[in-house]
Amino acid sequence: MPLVIPAIDIRDGRCVRLHQGDYDNETVYFEDPVKMAKLWRVQNAQTLHVVDLDAARGEGEHNRDVIGKMCDALDIPIQLGGGIRSMDQIEAALDRGVYRVILGTAAVRNPDFVERAVEQFSARRVVVSIDARDGEVRVQGWTEGSGLDAVAFAKDMEQRGVRRLVYTDISRDGTMDGPNIQAYRTLGRQLAHAKVTASGGVGEHDDLLDIQTLQPYGVDSVIVGTALYENRFPCQQFWAWQDKDAVDLDTFSTASLR
């Protein structure tokens, strides 16, 4: 089974989900990202995927403090994406406790920057996100097209030393309509060294089984957001939303750590 990575997207300090990347189609699921992160941890999360939606659109880094508190509160790695576009920002995120940073817009607009970042911080700490709609990479919080083909861009990133790519099919993101298996398979076939984390569309357990068939193509993990918030998996019945305030969020599970 692929590693399931819960997603926490933060906008204006709250946990939200966007439908197909549309900032005007937002659902607020939780007011406190730190408490949300702890809840995923007691559900045995082994790592978290955090996106700063405000920073992704260039609207400031006012969520960074709460992200630092999330890192302080947990004993598992956190990967952070959204608005990281300089070496100083990478260093600041890592110093804040983030385990791994995800480069998106910066990687598209300045591929040499990715190469330098991997060289300085290592491929384990720097990964690249490929956010695509109809095969075209999009940037600036998914609001602008780049004209780049997703597979060609992925191959370029691999040649520059990147060893993990987070591939999001924007048209599936937040829909729970099922992942774009063909897109992940097509991408994986073209890569020689980089692993792929799938993202977008997972809505039920069968979708995870579909992702599992992609392991021969280097797809070894999957980011899940809306489906977890909507309690689409049977094991989540143990932590029903109506009981969340009774859960001891300071007593972590025994999941394997980093």
Curated annotation (Swiss-Prot):
Q: Which CDD domains match?
A: HisA
Enzyme Commission number, as recorded: 5.3.1.16
Q: Entry's SUPFAM superfamilies?
A: Ribulose-phoshate binding barrel (SSF51366)
Biological or metabolic pathway of the protein: Amino-acid biosynthesis; L-histidine biosynthesis; L-histidine from 5-phospho-alpha-D-ribose 1-diphosphate: step 4/9
- Its domain of life reads Bacteria
* Active-site residues, record numbering mapped to chain: 9 (proton acceptor), 131 (proton donor)
- Record's keyword annotation contains Amino-acid biosynthesis: yes
Cellular component GO terms held in the UniProt record? cytoplasm
- What's the top EC group for this one? isomerase
Q: Read off the InterPro entries from this record.
A: Aldolase_TIM, His_biosynth, HisA_bact_arch, Isoase_HisA-like, Isoase_HisA-like_bact, RibuloseP-bd_barrel
Q: Which keywords label this protein? A: Amino-acid biosynthesis, Cytoplasm, Histidine biosynthesis, Isomerase
Spell out the subcellular localization from the entry.
Cytoplasm
Return any one Pfam family short name. Answer: His_biosynth
Return one Gene Ontology term, BP aspect: L-histidine biosynthetic process
Task: Please list the reactions this protein catalyses.
Answer: 1-(5-phospho-beta-D-ribosyl)-5-[(5-phospho-beta-D-ribosylamino)methylideneamino]imidazole-4-carboxamide = 5-[(5-phospho-1-deoxy-D-ribulos-1-ylimino)methylamino]-1-(5-phospho-beta-D-ribosyl)imidazole-4-carboxamide
Q: Does the keyword Transport apply?
A: no
Which molecular function term from Gene Ontology is one that the record holds?
1-(5-phosphoribosyl)-5-[(5-phosphoribosylamino)methylideneamino]imidazole-4-carboxamide isomerase activity
Q: Gene3D superfamilies, alphabetically? A: Aldolase class I
Q: Hey, which family's this protein in? A: Belongs to the HisA/HisF family.
The protein's name is: 1-(5-phosphoribosyl)-5-[(5-phosphoribosylamino)methylideneamino] imidazole-4-carboxamide isomerase
